[in-house]
């Protein structure tokens, strides 16, 4: 007699022996494999960048890149409350407690305990069609400062696994104001020191430092809301301009993908911008380049004279292009070259735009470790 089994069905040839287990394999339905499409950035860009923000400050930076139009963005944090304030589609809470309480070691251990989950999150948020991933952190807190080095190394491993376009991991580090207290300054000192070591080890490039103390001194009357908007908009907008401009053609002088890659691969990096509405003399352009460097809100206490490579892009409306001699721009670019160390390289680009006047955007790379800034943070922590 054939017995019916609700799982295996009916065996048409039952065996009388108890020594053999013969059965019909059940048909087990498998869930459909829905492949997630690769993210697509909103604007035309030369490089496919991804951004993983850690902590509240790093999360806000990553959110700003998302608002600009970058699609490969994810944010991790030890606190649900902080994640709730970040408007990005990909967010992950790690660790068993809520927040790190400015404790770098606590955040680091929580990250290590969740490392494989974070790798899965990176893959889900960033995908595999990527040139370089940037880690964004605030150096003064607990979560971002605590996980910074380990997150960078994890991203490096992930990039190697998927054969990303670059061997380097980008790092954007927001330094706190010195008035935020000794513990915050201590966290920032340790995090910046580790970040510079990662640059020396050829793991991180570029390292972009956003110095909130510098912003505070340049814009002392900014409201609380506008302060963070200015801080994040400066770095994100300038960064995007260079990544976007390398996709544009120019009949004058083109700043291309390889030019930008050279600066990105040079280590510590800083951006600047200057606008001139009415260009009446050569000295105006040269002065704009100088002021561009002096008033750079991202610079802090970096020694730009140690820079080894730079990009300088001039964008003018048609009227300005018709009126200023080429010699004016050449001399301005040469002045930038003289600002850097001997045998440096300045990659140039000249483009026609719609905004009235002349705008000059700069990116300087290969800058030496900011010893003065490290000393200032160490002193503030004592």
Q: Predicted segment positions?
A:
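Tubulin/FtsZ superfamily GTPase core signature
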Residues: 2-382
